[in-house]
Amino acid sequence: MMRRFLVSVGGGARDYVESIGLSARTFFTMLGLSPGLLRRPRLLVEQLHVIGNYSLLIIILSGLFVGMVLGLQGYYTLNKYGASESLGLLVALGLTRELGPVITALLFAGRAGTSLTAEIGLMKAGEQLSAMEMMAVNPIQRVLAPRFWAGVISVPLLTAMFSAVGILGGYLIGVELIGVDEGAFWSQMQGGVDVWKDVFNGFVKSVVFGIAITFIALYQGYEAQPTPEDVSGATTRTVVISSLMIWWLDFMLTALMFSK
C-alpha cells in the first residue's frame, strides 16, 4: 500500500518536472529561432492581423462597460466624501494600473488563446506539423514563433485600447450623465496619473501577460495528443492555466511595482 502511494506521488512529481522541462525547452527554442522572422515579416504581420481581430470587438465593448461601471460606482463612493471631482483620477488609475491589463489578458486568453490552442492542436492532429518536419521546415519557427510574437505585441495594444475606451465610458457616465465638472474630471486625471509609475507599469504588466498567455496557448496545442478529445481538453487547460497565471503574475508584479 505504501509502495503504491510512493510510486503514485513520485510518478506525478516526475511528470510535473518533465512538463516544466519540456515547456522551458520549447520556449527557449522558439526564442532562439525567432530572429528568422526578420526574413519573413509577412508571417508576423498576418498573425498580428488575425490575433488582433480575434479579440478587438470584445475588448472595445468590455472596456466601455467596465469604464461606465467604474465611473458609476466611483462617483457614488467619492460623493459620500465630497470628492466627486476626483472621479477622472479614480477611473484612470483603476484602468491603467489593474483593470486594463488584467481584464484584457483574461479576455485575450478566453478568445484568442483558445483559438491558438485549437489551431495548433488541429494542425498536429492533421499531421501538418509532421509534414513540415519531413520537408525540413521547423514548425516551431514557422508556426509557433510568428503567433507567439503576434500575441506578445497584441496584448499591450489591446490593453491600451481597453483603457482608453474605459476612460471614455467613465467620462460618459460621470460628466455627461451625472454632471461631474468636465474640467475637474480631466485635470484631476492629468495631475494624478504618473506616466512611469502608472501607465508604464501597466504596460509592463500587459507585456508579461501577453508572453505568458500566448506561450501557454501555443504549448498546450503543440503538446496535445492528435485526437479531438485531447485538443478539446487542451483548450480548456489554456483558459484555466492562463487565468491562474494572470492572477498570480498580477499579484507579484503589483507587489514589486507599487509596494514602495
Describe these PLM feature segments.
Residues 138-159, 234, 238:
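Start (N-cap) of specific transmembrane helices in multi-pass transporter permeases
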Residues 2-42, 221, 225:
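Short, membrane-interfacial amphipathic segments enriched in basic
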Residues 36-61, 240:
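Membrane-interface helix starts
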Residues 120-145, 228-231:
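Short cytoplasmic-facing helical segments at TM-TM junctions of multi-pass membrane proteins
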Residues 49-103, 107:
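Active-site cofactor/substrate anionic-group-binding motifs, chiefly glycine-
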Residues 87-130, 216:
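Hydrophobic alpha-helical transmembrane segments of multi-pass membrane transport proteins
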Residues 231, 237-254:
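Final/C-terminal transmembrane alpha-helix of multipass membrane proteins
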Residues 73-96, 164-207, 211, 215-235, ...:
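Membrane-interfacial helix-loop-helix connectors in multipass membrane proteins
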